[in-house]
Regions:
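Hydrophobic alpha-helical segments and their helix-loop junctions in multi-pass secondary transporters
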Residues: 178-211, 278-286, 415-430, 485-494
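Membrane-interface loop-to-helix entry segments
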Residues: 149, 154-196, 203, 262-266, ...
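Cytosolic C-terminal regulatory domains/tails of membrane transporters and channels
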Residues: 1-22, 491-686
C-alpha cells in the first residue's frame, strides 16, 4: 500500500529534484519577466474594472477621472519601484524576511512574513476569480458557475505546479507575450481610432447609470475621498514587486542587475497598459457598477432587469474591432496570463514559506529540503487556502480586491525601512568621502520610497478598512502570532533536548537504565506474537514477560492452551478487564510496573499486521496502534513495533516462527492473573 501511495504521489508531484539542480536554475530576462512578473502585468485585467467600479458610485460624470487615476497609479508605481531597485542588493543577499529580522527585530519580521504570504494567497484567489469572469464573459451560460470555475482552475494549477519550476519556466513566457502582442495591437489601434474620432461605443455605453450617491457633488472632500478609493482599488497594479526581489537567485548573472531591470520593465509595462485601457474605456463609454441590477439598466422603462457585465478590457477590445474574433482571442490570452500570474504566486509562496520555516517560524515540513518535490508542501498549502478564500467570497473580484494590496504595501514598507536603517548604520562607520556621498544618495532614494509606500498604505487602509482591509489586518496579526508561537515551541524543544554543558549532568543524561523489562503484548498465540517474543528475547532484557488481556474467557482459554502446548519459555501474565478496555488495562499495568522501579525502563513489544491494500485496514482492529499512541506519552516506557506483512507471508508460506523449546529440566511456564476492575473508564487494582 505504501509503495502504491508513493507511486501516486510521485505521479502527482514528480520525481525528486536535486537541490544543486534547483540552485543552478537561471532565467534570462525574457523568461524571468513572464514567470516572475506576470502577477503585476496581468493586474491590468481587473485593476481597470476596480477603478471604474469605484468612480461609478458618483455617476457617469465621475468616470472622466479614470485615466487620471490610472496615471497616478503608474507614477506612484514608478517611484516605488524606482526606489525599491536600490534595495535589491540587500534583499538578494539574505531575503527580505531575514533582512527585516536582523535590522528591525522579530515582530516586524513576522508581520512582513505574514503580509507576503497573504499577498500570494490573494494573488491566486483574485487572478483565478478574474479568469473565471473572463470565461463567463465568453460563455454567458456559465455565469452561475463562476466560483466553481475559479476553484477548478486553482486545483488544476496546483497539480501543474507540483511538477516543478522547470516545467513552468518552459511554458510561462508564451501566454504573456501573446497577451502583450494582442493587447498592444488593440490599444495602439484603439488610440488611433480615439484620436481620429472613429472609436465605436462600448456595449455598456448605452446603459443608464444611476449613481449610488445622487446628491453628492464632485468637488471638495467627497471628490478627494472618491479618488482615494479608486486609487486604492487600482493599486493592485503595484503587485509583483516582492516576488521579483525575493527571486534574484533564479536570474542569470549579473543577477541583481537583471532583477532590477526586470522589476522596472514590469512596472513600466503595467503602467502604460493600465492608463491606455482606462483612457479607451472612457472614450468608448464603458460603465461598470457593483450592483448592475440596481444601478445599471439597458432600458430605463424596465429597471431591475438582469445585466451580465463584461470586463472593461473585453468591452474595449469589442469597441475597437467591432467583431468577436480578436476580442475572444484577447480574452483567452487574458485568462492564460492570469493563470501564469497565479503560477508566479505558486513560485513565491513556497520559497517565502521555506525561508521563514528555515528560521523556525513556520512548521519545518514547509522547508524546501524536507519535501520530495522541494516545494510540494507549500504548493498544496497555497492551493488549499486560495480555494477557501475563493469559496468564501464566491469568486467576487471586487470583494477580494478589498483585502488585496495591504500585505504588499506592508511588506515593502518594512523592507525599505530595514534598508534605510542598515545604510544609516553603515554611514556612521564610513569615512571615505565618495563612499559617504553614495550612501547618502541611496539613503535619500530609499527614504523617498518609504514615504511614498507609507502614504499608499495609509490610503489603502483608510479607504478600504470597513470594506475588507480590516480582515487582512486581522489575518496578518493572527498569522504573526502563530509564527511567534511556532518559534517559541521550537525554542522550547531545543532547550529541553539540548545536551547539558555540565559533564556530570551530561553523564546522567547518557546513563544506562538500571534494568530493562520487556513486555510482549499478546492478543492471540499466532506467528506475529511468536516473532515479537523472538525479538524481545534476542534483545536480552533483564526480565521478559508476555501480557494478555482477559476480554473474552473463551479466547483466554485458547491462548493459555496454545501457550502450554507450544512450551513457550516466557511467563504469561493475564490482566482482567471487565469493561473490555484493552488500552487502559495495559497502560495501567505498565504504569504500576514503572512505579515499582522508577530507574528501570519498560519496553513494550507490539506485534502488528501490515496489509497490502488500504481497504484491508478497515477489516482489522487498531488496538496495537492505539496502544502505541497511548504508551508514547509514558515516561520511561519505549515501544517496539514488530511488523508482520500479510502479503509477504502469502508469497513465502513456508516461513514460520517457532518458539525455542525449553530444556527438559526447566520448569513449565506459569500464568499470573492480575484482576483489574474498571469503573467509568478509570482503572484500579483490586
Amino acid at each position: 500500500m505504501n509503495n502504491r501511495w508513493g507511486r501516486m504521489r510521485r505521479a502527482l508531484t514528480g520525481g525528486p529534484v536535486d537541490s544543486r539542480q534547483l540552485a543552478a536554475t537561471s532565467l534570462p530576462k525574457r523568461y524571468a519577466l513572464p514567470l516572475l512578473g506576470s502577477d503585476g502585468i496581468s493586474s491590468v485585467a481587473y485593476a481597470a474594472d476596480e477603478v471604474i467600479l469605484i468612480l461609478a458610485v458618483a455617476g457617469a460624470g465621475a468616470l472622466t477621472y479614470s485615466p487620471w487615476v490610472g496615471f497616478a497609479i503608474a507614477v506612484v508605481g514608478l517611484v516605488i519601484v524606482g526606489t525599491y531597485r536600490y534595495n535589491i542588493r540587500q534583499v538578494a543577499a539574505e531575503g527580505d524576511f531575514a533582512l527585516v529580522r536582523r535590522k528591525l527585530g522579530r515582530r516586524p519580521a513576522v508581520v512582513l512574513g505574514a503580509s507576503v504570504l497573504l499577498d500570494y494567497v490573494l494573488t491566486v484567489a483574485v487572478s483565478m476569480s478574474s479568469a473565471a469572469t473572463f470565461i463567463t464573459a465568453l460563455f454567458p451560460q456559465l455565469q452561475g458557475f463562476r466560483a466553481g470555475i475559479a476553484v477548478t482552475l486553482i486545483v488544476v494549477l496546483s497539480v501543474v505546479c507540483l511538477r516543478g519550476v522547470q516545467l513552468m519556466g518552459r511554458l510561462a513566457h508564451w501566454p504573456l507575450y501573446i497577451f502583450l502582442a494582442l493587447l498592444g495591437i488593440t490599444l495602439v489601434y484603439g488610440l488611433l481610432q480615439a484620436f481620429t474620432g472613429t472609436l465605436a461605443r462600448a456595449e455598456s455605453a448605452g446603459y443608464t447609470l444611476t449613481p449610488e450617491t445622487p446628491h453628492a457633488s464632485l468637488d471638495g472632500v467627497f471628490l478627494v475621498l472618491l479618488l482615494s478609493r479608486s486609487f486604492s482599488a487600482g493599486a493592485v497594479a503595484l503587485s509583483g514587486v516582492s516576488t521579483i526581489s525575493n527571486s534574484v537567485r533564479f536570474f542569470k548573472a549579473p543577477k541583481q542587475r537583471n532583477a532590477a531591470l526586470t522589476l522596472m520593465l514590469m512596472i513600466v509595462i503595467t503602467g502604460v497598459l493600465l492608463v491606455s485601457i482606462l483612457y479607451l474605456a472612457r472614450q468608448s463609454g464603458v460603465q461598470l457598477v457593483q450592483n448592475p441590477s440596481r444601478y445599471l439598466s439597458a432600458d430605463p422603462s424596465s429597471p431591475n432587469q438582469p445585466i451580465h457585465q463584461k470586463p472593461a478590457l473585453y468591452q474595449v477590445a469589442f469597441a475597437v474591432y467591432g467583431n468577436d474574433l480578436i476580442p475572444t482571442l484577447l480574452a483567452l490570452a487574458t485568462v492564460a496570463v492570469l493563470v501564469i500570474a497565479s503560477l508566479t504566486a505558486f513560485i513565491g509562496f513556497p520559497m517565502g514559506a521555506s525561508a521563514i520555516a528555515d528560521r523556525h517560524y513556520l512548521p519545518h515540513r514547509l522547508r524546501s529540503v524536507d519535501s520530495t518535490g522541494l516545494y510540494s508542501n507549500g504548493v498544496i498549502l497555497l492551493g488549499v487556502i486560495s480555494v477557501l478564500f475563493t469559496v468564501l467570497f464566491a469568486a467576487d473580484v471586487f470583494a477580494l480586491i478589498q483585502l488585496y494590496v495591504v500585505g504588499m504595501c506592508t511588506s515593502m514598507l518594512l523592507t525599505q525601512v530595514a534598508v534605510v536603517r542598515f545604510r544609516l548604520r553603515k554611514l556612521r562607520i564610513t569615512l571615505k568621502p565618495s563612499a559617504r556621498r553614495k550612501l547618502a544618495r541611496d539613503i535619500t532614494v530609499s527614504a523617498v520610497g518609504v514615504v511614498v509606500t507609507a502614504l499608499v498604505l495609509v490610503t489603502v487602509v483608510g479607504t478600504k478598512f470597513l470594506a475588507g482591509a480590516w480582515l487582512s489586518l486581522t489575518f496578518i496579526l493572527l498569522l504573526s502570532e502563530v509564527m511567534l508561537m511556532t518559534r517559541r515551541h521550537y525554542a522550547r524543544v531545543d532547550k529541553l533536548t539540548e545536551i547539558p554543558l555540565d559533564q556530570e549532568a551530561a553523564a546522567d543524561a547518557a546513563a544506562l537504565p538500571s534494568r530493562v523489562h520487556a513486555v510482549v503484548y499478546i492478543e492471540r498465540v499466532r506467528q506475529p506474537a511468536l516473532r515479537a517474543l523472538a525479538y524481545a528475547r534476542a534483545a536480552r532484557p533483564s526480565t521478559i514477560e508476555a501480557l494478555t488481556v482477559n476480554n473474552d474467557r473463551q479466547l483466554l482459554a485458547t491462548v493459555k492452551e496454545r501457550w502450554d502446548m507450544l512450551h513457550i519459555p516466557v511467563q504469561l501474565s493475564v490482566i482482567d478487564s471487565p469493561y473490555r478496555d484493552t488500552v487502559s488495562s495495559v497502560l495501567d499495568y505498565v504504569r504500576r510496573k514503572r512505579k515499582k522501579s522508577p530507574r528501570d525502563v519498560v519496553v513494550v513489544y507490539l506485534p502488528e499486521f501490515v496489509v497490502a491494500h488500504w481497504w484491508q485496514e478497515i477489516l482489522h482492529r487498531r488496538t496495537v496502534r492505539r496502544l502505541k499512541k497511548a504508551l508514547l506519552h509514558e515516561p520511561g516506557v519505549a515501544t517496539a513495533t514488530v511488523p508482520w506483512a500479510l502479503h509477504a507471508a502469502e508469497t513465502q508460506p513456508g516461513e514460520t516462527v517457532a518458539p525455542t523449546q525449553p530444556p527438559s529440566s526447566e520448569e513449565p511456564p506459569t500464568h499470573r492473573v492480575h484482576r483489574l476492575a474498571l469503573y467509568r473508564g478509570k482503572t484500579g487494582a483490586t
